[in-house]
């Protein structure tokens, strides 16, 4: 095969790997965001069914927002080379978080400065740069015309908070994956919109539950399924949720969504 064919095959293989790594990390990030919303006392959330659903839906939306911004920044739709934008960017935040975590510094759960910064970024994307008083010469972002960033359509995300430790861990899971030489930044520009779409679709399959008793995820017929830990027997346990902790499960009782790659462009309704 020609050199170009080989490059194409390699980049496709890389995108597939990024996609599958990301699916596992997205799963973990969603659980951490949910835990973060519950852990913040000022959010006044109980573990009622209603609050669990609300946290599930909004952790999902927050994930969509973060994935959207990672993708848009990687494609320079949001220009991280612009000094004004860079100060507010997710790129700057992910680098700051990575540096802290690599130095063994744990961000504090009681502070929510990362969240405040993100909320400004969400507002910038929703309202556009001119609403912030920037001239077109300084930099320009048109107002985003969808529901995803609209504060009125997402009152939970406009009023609740999440502590730095939870947000840092979730953002780092989305920003970096474990490579052969340690952690490396995920190249979102290698994903096409369908890859991102299949990850979005996978997220939609998740339901947040609170474990009534200790739960274990075990491999069964090539899939990971959740069951009470006492029923796990000698099977290899891949994940656990202690009683009272949150865990994510699909409608089929599986631990992880199977979001197939190369699904049609249904994602367009989000973006």
Annotate each language-model stretch with its function.
Residues 1-270:
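Preference for the N-terminal adenyl/adenosyl cofactor-binding alpha/beta module
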């Amino acid at each position: 095969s020609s050199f170009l064919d080989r490059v194409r095959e390699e980049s496709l293989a890389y995108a597939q790997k990024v996609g599958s790594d990301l699916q596992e990390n997205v799963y973990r990030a969603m659980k951490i965001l949910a835990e973060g919303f519950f852990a913040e006392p000022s959010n006044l959330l109980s573990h009622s069914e209603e609050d669990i659903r609300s946290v599930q839906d909004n952790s999902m939306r927050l994930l969509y927002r973060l994935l959207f911004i990672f993708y848009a920044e990687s494609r320079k739709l949001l220009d991280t080379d612009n000094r004004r934008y860079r100060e507010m960017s997710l790129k700057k935040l992910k680098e700051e978080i990575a540096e802290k975590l690599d130095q063994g510094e744990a961000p504090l759960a009681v502070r929510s400065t990362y969240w405040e910064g993100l909320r400004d970024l969400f507002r910038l994307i929703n309202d556009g740069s001119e609403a912030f008083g920037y001239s077109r010469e300084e930099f320009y972002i048109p107002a985003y015309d969808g529901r995803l960033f609209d504060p009125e359509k997402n009152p939970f995300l406009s009023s609740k908070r999440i502590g730095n430790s939870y947000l840092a861990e979730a953002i780092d899971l989305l920003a970096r994956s474990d490579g052969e030489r340690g952690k490396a930044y995920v190249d979102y520009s290698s994903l096409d919109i369908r890859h991102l779409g299949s990850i979005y679709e996978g997220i939609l399959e998740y339901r947040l539950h609170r474990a009534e008793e200790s739960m274990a995820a075990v491999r069964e017929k090539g899939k990971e399924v959740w069951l009470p830990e006492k029923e796990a027997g000698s099977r290899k346990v891949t994940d656990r949720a202690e009683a009272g902790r949150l865990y994510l499960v699909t409608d089929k009782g599986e631990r992880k969504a199977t979001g197939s790659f190369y699904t049609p462009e249904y994602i367009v309704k989000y973006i």
